[in-house]
Amino acid sequence: YFIDRPMGFLYTPDLSKAPQLPEIKKSQLFADFGWATMRTSWEKDATMLAVKSGHTWNHSHADANSFIIFHKGVDIIKDAGNCWYPNPSYRNYFFQSEAHNVVLFNGKGQSREQQYHGSMLRGYLHYLLDADNVKYVLANGTGPYSDQFSRNFRHFLWIDDVIYMIDDLKTHDVGHFEWLWHPGGEAEKRGIDLNITNGNSSVVVRLLYPRLLAKSD
């Protein structure tokens, strides 16, 4: 019925000639809205790293330099969650930096006023590289954090099965940093590692600097 009508190509597309997997690039930088994605393949159980650093306002959360990782069909490192807009938890938590995988300084992320007034200076993504087993992208979140940071760079270097995340940070004042990670599965600390497991998907998080995780008792 729909095939012979103008909207038919949307509701009943002919997929008989479509390739089994998309014949497009595995890495892409969407500079205008501040997203970059890198993946091992287009298979369903592939690994994908997605990085965000762009504008902050309204639907665009306070998550400059944040990232998520999908592995074997599971968002194994993810945002904290979501809720509907009228719920006070949306504006008080889920929109804010604390609900994302970012670095806090003295317990604070991006200014909470950016939700309704926007960030005067946006974040950026640069230098996307995909050489198959070596991938790279730089996230520059200095702008949205400029009330606290004079430099907020996050380098993502993906070599084979290891993703190195290097934070280059400089703040206006003396204080302490806090790294936020939101696991998408059971998290267990084993020695200097944090193991996150969800079904057949798992990831090992190891902090190298400024210090290792303390060994478990």
Predicted region positions:
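CBM-like, beta-strand-rich accessory domains located in the C-terminal region of large
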Residues: 1-2, 83-217
